[in-house]
Amino acid sequence: DSPGGASDAQKQHDVNSILXKVYXEI
């Protein structure tokens, strides 16, 4: 398991969170 994978998953989670906020405002 490389730390890059965990970091990637975390970034993906952050992106999903931001997208949800943006869509909620639209």
UniProtKB/Swiss-Prot annotation:
Keywords attached to this entry: Copper, Oxygen transport, Secreted, Transport
GO cellular component: extracellular region
Example GO biological process: oxygen transport
Cellular localisation: Secreted, Extracellular space
Superkingdom per UniProt: Eukaryota
Main location: secreted
An example molecular function term from Gene Ontology annotations: oxygen carrier activity
Similarity-based family: Belongs to the tyrosinase family. Hemocyanin subfamily.
Known function: Hemocyanins are copper-containing oxygen carriers occurring freely dissolved in the hemolymph of many mollusks and arthropods.
Name this protein carries in UniProt: Hemocyanin subunit B
Source organism per UniProt: Carcinus maenas
Lineage: Eukaryota, Metazoa, Ecdysozoa, Arthropoda, Crustacea
